[in-house]
């Protein structure tokens, strides 16, 4: 059983870009737009990119393994929607092509520990929970 609700999963599957937040060795935050996919088998968010293994975000994850990930958009007339996922992340040397064929082999895998969502479906709703 997934940690995500059906509405959250449906929303995730309609989005292509998210923002990954990590912290560097000086304790400074870094955020970057990234490509991703929901990994149904592991119930994780898998993040890929070009030259991912050489990136600051990959080094940050290798060092401390903490990350937050946000997917958001706005639908007319003005309805912001958002899914924030906080959790434990792994920097892996293989699997990036599963996100998008053009990506490098490196992969960041985020396992949710806290999920915050609002208005991810047609119903106006807000949810925050530890998972």
Feature-to-residue mapping (PLM):
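Short, basic/aromatic recognition patches
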Residues: 1-19
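A generic structural signal for nonpolar/aromatic side chains embedded in well-ordered alpha-helices
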Residues: 12, 60-61, 110
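Short beta-strand segments
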Residues: 16-50, 69
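A structural signal for short, well-ordered beta-strand segments
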Residues: 36, 87-89, 112
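Structural motif
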Residues: 42-44, 66, 88, 114
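Short, structured beta-strand-loop surface elements
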Residues: 51-105
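C-terminal edge-of-domain segments
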Residues: 80, 93-131
């Amino acid at each position: 059983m997934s940690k995500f609700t059906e509405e959250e999963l449906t929303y995730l599957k309609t989005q292509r870009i998210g923002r990954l937040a990590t912290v560097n060795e000086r304790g400074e935050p870094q955020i970057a737009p990234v490509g991703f996919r929901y990994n149904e088998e592991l119930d994780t968010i898998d993040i890929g990119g070009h030259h991912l293994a050489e990136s600051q975000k990959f080094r940050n994850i290798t060092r401390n393994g903490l990350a937050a990930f946000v997917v958001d958009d706005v639908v007319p007339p003005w309805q912001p929607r958002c899914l924030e996922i906080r959790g434990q992340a792994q920097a892996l040397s293989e699997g990036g092509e599963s996100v998008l064929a053009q990506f490098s082999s490196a992969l960041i895998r985020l396992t949710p520990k806290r999920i915050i969502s609002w208005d991810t479906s047609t119903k106006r709703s807000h949810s925050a929970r530890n998972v």
